[in-house]
Amino acid sequence: MACNYLRPGASFGLNLLVVVLLVLAVSPRAQAQQAESAARLAPLTDQIRLGAEYFLNRTDTAESVRHHFQLMHKYGLTIARVFIIWDDIERERDQWDLHRYDWIYDAAQESDIKIAATLCAEDPPGWMKLTPFYHHRMNLNDPKLRERSAIYIEKVVGRYRNHPAQGPWLLMNEPALQVNYERTTMEAFGKWLQERYGSVDRLNQRWFQPLQNFSDVQVSPEQWIPGWTDYYSFIDWKEFNIDNLCDGLRWIEQQVRALDTTHPTHINPSGLTHNLPAAGTDLWKESAIVDFLGASIHPQWLFSEFEPSDFGLWFAYCLDLLRSAAGTRPWWVTELGGGPTIYSAGVRPMNPGKSELARWLWDAFGAGARGVVFWLWNPRVLGNEAGEVALVSLDGDPSPRVVAVKEIADTLNRLPELAQAKAVAPRVAILYDREALLLIGLDGRAQAAAKRAQEPLWSLEGTFAALHRMHVPIDFTDIQELKTGAAQRYDVLYLPYSYALDDQAVQALREYVRKGGTLWADGLAAWKNEYGEVRPRIPGGLGDVFGADTSDIYPVEKPYSVTAANEQAEELWRLPLELKGAQVLVRDREGQPFAVRHQYGKGQAIYFGTALTLGYFRRNNGQVQKWIVEPALAANAGMPVKLEKGSGQISFRALEGPGRAFAVLSNWGQAETVVVSFTGDYAKVVNALSGAAMKLTRATGKTVVTVPLQADAVLVLEAQKP
């Protein structure tokens, strides 16, 4: 059943005003910090860069290093990422030797390449006898480790801060800290609890095991084994681990900044298709620590649960999640698998070909990335990834992958205008509900075999898939952005499986709709707060906003269709909605409300009483997709660059720059004919990859191009003003 989903009085101008007001609200100190950060970034992000990790093997020589950097320069790379492994430079206590890394920096300078230096301050050397090998993160809460780490940072940053080849400092590779229950970590946890609760009495009103003092806290994983569990201590511990990682990163950043105020800082979180909060990662919090954000996106490892035909979809998901957390600042794809995986990739061994590399790279550039760095240039000679993932061949000669990358580097050099363009701002966002993603770690345990703990994540991904396949530009927004009112810049906000939301978030949603936003939700929206305390009705505290609610839940063992189309829309639950002013959009086969719409204030709220987005993730049904995307399509109608016709196998991106607009299409399916429109009167549109002029038509204020798109191909259209 179709309905007019565009909210009453919808106005892009209003959203622009919201953005302006948010910018004006930034404090003078924050503005000064942003200006300093922008100055550090400018020399590095003034162009779109390609790069690769250079791994310093112990068999390397000064001459072999120089040869590799000459090849990198020849094939268009301007960034070389390097791990400055602590054990490499301090094999014995206080015996520091960096001469082999000097080879790298000097070779980079000769080849006009910037070094992205990865610090390893959390990864102590072998002589300390704390780890069995490198890449084993240790506890940065330990003051003894921090003391040695500070010396390591001073030796590295102090040596290279004035080197002409120095680029950004990566504070930590794929940031994560060892989850531990050591005394120093408990001391940090006690201080965190004191900041959260203020008094022990307040904490003791919640925790099962009372404390005399915050400093007495001691937890262990045995407290949260399956069965009856103290939810309060579990959620506090999980939130602490997120903040504890941020504190460790912040400490490293402070050590770097005390030595070097010139070069930017960077990090590359990983696992973007996984439950990040459950693993101790908050992209938005980590992004705030550094000058610019990046991520590791390895299809070979990250997409093992997906079909290769959907790799483009999930690569796009990672890009949009990364871009959203980066905000208005530049961002990179800091690791992208560049070569064969034989043993290291588990169930997905592969070797990306020319067309795959092209689609990944152009989709990243179309999404707004200022750089893509491959993992890696040259193969390791020993270890878990020995002989794998490299761009060059095993003997060090350029492979067909290197040649393919050079073609793209040459195209970027011919298209300086692309570096001046920015991705078109989405009008649609999905709430990345950290609180639901944490709470499900407890709620989902009892049915682990059914992977219940994955449901909020899969619903989030299902929402993205439904929208991306309809070529709707998408942002993600987090809980804190929601609470500050930043979500008001979006016409439509999606809440997939957001069954846990704190009281402030619920109130922020109310304000979002009251001020003119369209809120779309499904399932047990806001049923619980962040600790798992249930609210008496669903949607929790928002019945007047949605114009319907319920106090009962009917679990559904198997998917159930509500229409004659056999769409299997009902998933997990059927909610007996009680109408309180809402308009019924869809009724089930028994005539009961299945989906409702309600005007509240200047906006509207749409609600489906089942886990609709989870069902779409699992079955990719067209009718279910339509129910999800209708409000987004209405909001997307006036976008300046649109894919008017094209299948869901196309990843579509739009950018605008001075006097130009770009459309980037990456086809992960069969050959087809596509139609792209540019709002306004453009003098010509060219295929930016071939230089060929496109035939134009004009209709209702748009410049329209119809063009064939080959299977597994990339099309970049550049529209030029007169």
Question: How would you label these PLM feature ranges?
Answer:
Residues 496-722:
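A conserved amphipathic helix/loop scaffold
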Residues 266-269, 273-462, 548, 552-566, ...:
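Hydrophobic targeting/anchoring helices
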Residues 43-49, 74, 83, 92-95, ...:
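Aromatic- and acidic-residue-enriched carbohydrate-binding clefts of CAZyme catalytic domains
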Residues 59-74, 149-155, 275-286, 353-361, ...:
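Short, acidic/polar
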Residues 32-79, 91, 106, 110, ...:
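N-terminal carbohydrate-binding accessory modules
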Residues 66-135, 157, 246-260:
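Aromatic-lined substrate-binding rim segments of carbohydrate-active enzymes
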Residues 137-155, 159-313, 321:
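Polysaccharide-binding and catalytic clefts of secreted carbohydrate-active enzymes
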Residues 50-60, 83-99, 132-150, 172-179, ...:
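The substrate-binding groove and active-site-proximal loops of carbohydrate-active enzymes
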